[in-house]
Swiss-Prot record, chain A:
Gene name of this polypeptide: ESA1
Residue span(s) of domain Tudor-knot: 39-92
Protein name in UniProt: Histone acetyltransferase ESA1
Region of interest: Disordered: 1-26, 98-163
Subunit structure: Component of the NuA4 histone acetyltransferase complex.
UniProtKB/Swiss-Prot annotation, chain B:
Biased composition, class Basic and acidic residues, residue ranges: 608-620, 828-839
Protein's name according to its UniProt entry: Enhancer of polycomb-like protein 1
Compartment list: Nucleus
Function: Component of the NuA4 histone acetyltransferase complex which is involved in transcriptional activation of selected genes principally by acetylation of nucleosomal histone H4 and H2A. The NuA4 complex is also involved in DNA repair. Involved in gene silencing by neighboring heterochromatin, blockage of the silencing spreading along the chromosome, and required for cell cycle progression through G2/M.
Biased composition regions of type Gly residues, renumbered to the chain: 697-713
Amino acid sequence: MALAEADLPNGKTNGKASGSEETPAPVQKVDMNVAINELRVGCKVHVEKDGEDRVAEILSVQMRRGNLEFYVHYVEFNKRLDERIAATRVDLSQGVIWPEPEKPKKPLSGAAKESSKEKKKNPSKKQKLTDSAATTPGANSEDVMDLDNLQVNGTTQDPDNFNRDEEIEKLRTGGSMTQSSHEVARVRNLQRIVLGNHVIEPWYFSPYPIELTEEDEIYICDFTLCYFGSKKQFERFRSKSTLRHPPGNEIYRDEAVSFFEIDGRKQRTWCRNLCLLSKLFLDHKTLYYDVDPFLFYCMTRRDEKGHHLVGYFSKEKESAEGYNVACILTLPQYQRHGYGRLLIDFSYALSKAEGKTGSPEKPLSDLGLLSYRAYWADTIIELLMEKGKQEMTIEDIASVTAMTTTDVLHTLQTYNMLKYYKGQHIICLTDSVCEKYEKMLKKRRRKVNSELLKWKPPVFTAAQLRFAW
Amino acid sequence: MAKAAKAAGSSARFRQRKISVKQTLAVLKQSDIPDLEEEQQRELQQIETGVEKGEEEEHHLQAAINSSIAQSTGAKVEKIYIPTPDASQVWKEYDRFYSSSFHEPASYIRTSVTVEETSGCLYNMDDEDAEFLKTCKPPISEDDFEEVMHRFEVTISEKQPFVSIDVSNLLSFEEMAQHIEDGIRQVQEDPTSPEYILAQLQSSLGITVNGTKGKNEGKAFLATFKKIGAVIYPHWRARKVERKGQSIVPHLKFEDHEKDDSDPYVCFRRRELRQVRKTRRTDVLSIERLRRMQAEMETAKQLVEMVATREFTRKAALKAEWDVFEDRCAIKTLKRELGIKGEDEDLVAQKKRKVEPKKEEKAEKASTPVRGGKAAGSAASAQAAAAQAAAAGSGSPSVSSTHVPPNVSIPPSKIPNMDLITIAQVVRDKDEAIAKAVREKLRLRADADRDWHNLTNSGYIPYCEYLNAEVSSSGEPPVPQYSSINEMAYFEKHNASHRYTTKSDFNKDLASMVGNKPFADAQVYGAIVGDDGELRLSDATSTSSPVDRVIPRSSFMSMRKRVGRGGRMWMDRRGLQRNTVLKPSSLAKNSLDDTAESEADEVAMERLADRQKYDRETEPTRQMSSYDKDPSQLNGISSDTQSIRFGSMLLSKAYENYREVFQQRQQQLMMLQQQILQQQQQQQMRNRQQSHPPGDPGAGLGGGQGAGGGAGGSRNNSPAPGTNGPQSKMHNAAPMGYNKQGMTPSQHQQYQQMQQQQQQQQQQQQQRKMGVAPMNAASAAAAMAAQPRRSSGSPDGQRFNGLPNGGAMANGVLPNGMSQRMMPGGDMKQKSELAKVDA
């Protein structure tokens, strides 16, 4: 951790100065004489975080029990680390950066500094994009890829040129469940949730009924995922409810976990509850539209009380872009236990059963990216090491693993395995890769046993895929 | 990033930038390739991650990425996790809320129950409600309270969906109670409501579905509601007003009527219809499919209705029958009591209607064995015969109208009381009517055609009138050539109806035409040759006799060559009849020239008979039935073939005719010259005649055979080539063997003399009449033939074999009292050729 911070000092005050050097145009006006009660939404202040001094943007100002509180977003930290702080943690001695004057009426818009930076970058980036489009016509053909410019779907959009109408139109026709974070409330609205026997701090905003946001903690039923602001209500509900597992068909069961397939159209309440819950932990998920066009694959752990939800991924019934996952989440209480990898493995197992290659819908979250990269790398390395093959095509790897060829190339490049040797490209099993494989063998990770999968790719008629009433 | 791109560009000249996913890549371990040049490798560059740009630069993510990159390059770095908010706390009250009652089924779980179905009453009381309940007297159970609250909420959302606009309009308890009661009653009485069905199922199957309300529950609830509804209502109303008309339990914000995209709490909007590209064709198809389905449903509905109607009718019929029976019973007792004695007919169930169908059925039964293949002899009885006829007439398993399909039983009272006709009968009647009509048509046709002859078989040959005019004007009896041409000539003369060429002919023959009898029975061949050796046909009076008419037909003779023992060749002929005309007298005349003194003994007769066994080539008894009865039929040849045949014949003959006339003229000129020469020669010859050898080289024939007529014919240069054919065939037909037998050299000489005379006569005739008609030539030939002569085959005779029937006729019409004979094997080759022609 220490090393990483030393490498990347951008988040700190010093780093920020260097950042402004890079982009000299917006002159950051640092006002040294500001009183604490003059601070308003959009202001950037120095805040003490875990013993460090970080720049934070004020997202909301509240009076609680007579104390002034700020809800702040730490610059260059993920939003899930946004928090409510007491006024005492704000260090006014280092000055205050006022929001951009041209955007004073948009307190919830992107951070001033960030956006200006983006604007500076934009022209060059666009230039590059158009250049590559012009010079690499091969990118259009399916099996030839430019190693210098591997495009990943869903990431080419410029956040500043984000057009609201376009975005909604895309949601409407594309069936995507992700949405730009710029369009949702940036302030986390729930303090704590009680889910099963876990008390969890939510990460992001979720459109639970606004009445519930007033509660300190809300109770979410472990089986039905119904939410209650009052413990009495929850108690009454629990006394009546008989559901002990996700309301769908179990399609996989091994000694540790089960998978349930749930149709969003048939289990609207449950799936909506699931989406509300997962929105608490997924920034880019949108609940703008209903759950009908999705299937939900839910991973559960069994005990004597029933099937407890561990994680899930949703999948479009018909994906125009060939995505095999729309949203994927391991509930925070189960994270870092290998369940995410199991979920990913299961999503590829389904793709294998379908005889397709697939890729997760973009954008990925930071955690998602790391999980997927780790899974991809392990899968490919295992394939290459175990089979002991002398030669392979990218397509071979893709068809065996159900990964897209782009993801395969992407991974090979990330792990520096694609080399140029004697005038030809080769896949090089570097020493570090071999080392990694040795480690993997020791770990004995959980995997999906495809023999336990009792599943046929569901087939939907055109009428079933229409999303109107 | 820009740097990286630049670096990649600088190394681009060393390495391929693009890679095909189909390109085979060698998989090598780094340890195996120590010579890998690191400089040529790509500079580690930013790879697109799929993470949003803003987030990609986040501190923790970068740290994690860099750590993993560092790992991949071999550096020892600690694994970095992205920090997340706390989730490690455990809720202590967990066990109080979740009971341990779950048992894992052995098989995979399959379920489709929804959250609502498993959650019991959807209203969950909160602390405020609990407070209220505590104050209630008498105490109300939580379940009842929730039930009532839920009912209030449901009812208000149904009846006052927009109550949130003005909460003061909230329904009063009385109104509310009324609505609730109505609602419950309605649900209970509506047989289509799921509650009703569920209640029915539950009562009939004895099962209860958790958390659902059956019929009884509805009633029970109504009772509870009456008890506690009024108590709870004020509380509910207060809470509702507090919530400003919104539902008491907070719910998700769904899309309002005005679209508010900016409210982040609005979620789960209805997705608009995905715009499906529609083509009219699919529309039409689906509409068509729907229509068909609707029609099918309609049909099914009608069927069901009809079945229902039928069953009702049947029930009524049974009822009526039952009534009748009961009435009869009553009458019976009445009769007994009152001592009425009479006929009991009215007491017996009359089954008259059933009788007839039964009979029919019997008939059907009788017909089945006959149809089953039994001998017709068994069908002796009239009934059986009728049945058989019926069966035969129908040709298929006869289904009479009285037959009832096995699965539909019509009560006997419903069978109509009428005479029923079998289908077989109907079919038979129809067939007979058709046959009768056809017969009648044929008869009428025959009547109309009675005076007409179909001569298409022997071909009508139009020829120039001037040829014919001479004959008719000369009054000389025409010499029949027995070719079709002659036939025509004959008919032209005697039956003007066949001739259309000139007016003069028509006028001239009008009278005879009127007097003419139709020759309907001109089939007799044998009559051609009279016993006296004269041609009957030449007699003008004989034309009135239809029997004498000769209409030569094709000889229905066929031949076969076969090789017998010792390599002998045999010619078999079929279609010959014994020569009944053969007479000993004529035989004697014919064959006994050399042995005149011997008597006709039996052996000789036998031998003769044997020899003449096959002499007749034609069948005298062969009936030209098709000819006189139906002119439209000829030799069984189809009319199409006939018309083609006839047409081609007409053409060829017309051409031939024309050519012949032309040639004749030339020949006549030449002959005139020759004649002069001949006369001079003849005078010279007469002087030396006594010393002349019999085989005259001028004859151009085998000397031993004594070519007489043939030689004459050829020497004569065949006066009329058109008529030469039949004549020469006649020669052909004459067997050579007879020459030796029947002629002495002296006779031969005489014959030659006579021939010469004949020629002279002929030439004179020809001189006299410049227009030489075929008749003329024929007459000359006939005149020659009238003399007893033996002719040998003439080589040029074969030239005209192509004339139809010519060869066959030749024999029959030889105007010789002695019938010409053919010797089997005598002239094999020529005969076989004849046969070919006939075929």
